[in-house]
Amino acid sequence: WSQNLPILGWLFLKGRAKCCGNKILPRYFLVELFTGLIFAWACYAFTQNQDLGMLLASCSFAWLMIGVVAVDTETMLIPDRFSLGGACLGFVLSLYFPSLHGVIHHPMGIEKILGAFQSLLGILIGSGLLYWIGALAGRAFRREALGEGDVKLLGCVGAFCGWKGAVFSIFGGAVFGCIFLFLLFLFQKIKPAQSSAQDNLAFGKEIPFGPYLALAGMGYFFGLREWIDPWFSWMHALGF
């Protein structure tokens, strides 16, 4: 059983399977480590003010997004259990814990309704906006530019982060993706011998967008919100 302990099992086995000696890819260790760090931070941050709703929501959102990063990077597919299931979970959590969207108290006692409304708005605006971006890009390039999984994933992000977090994730994900691809392209130019022909970047090659959307959503949820939200203050006049 000790070999199956998260993080420690990989270290005890020194990155190799005990039965055959084959190498265990470091990504499993990194996923476990990153998940553990996020959960530990959430426990520390939200138990201080006894906000158990935010603790549950933050751990759930982190688990979903880390799963998307790991799966989409390897398979270029985002399972519906992460995207659609995550959107449903985010909506339910927003209904029971409206503080997820900053709704603490309302004179009319409709905090839960407002929390659910913000979540639903995030789902519709996030997935709808990305759908039309993908549709227009598909027309322009005459090929599929975005997969349906990305559209559904942004609905999940919107359910947890609201419409502002969903909009930020589109553009933040694009920035993160461009930075990563630039660094990867630079590495391939500097050390071409260490880059396989299959992994080399080329114009028209499909790359997963889901991981960058997920990372941008996590960035917003776990710290960037207070810097991003003021940029949308002009929308308050429209009732959002």
Model-predicted segments: where are they?
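Membrane-interfacial, low-structure loops and terminal tails that flank and connect transmembrane helices
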Residues: R16, I104-K112, K191-L201
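Functional transmembrane core segments of multi-pass inner-membrane proteins
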Residues: M54, S60-F185, D229-F240
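Interfacial loop-to-transmembrane junctions
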Residues: E148-G149, L186-G219
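Transmembrane helix-loop-helix
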Residues: Y44-L56
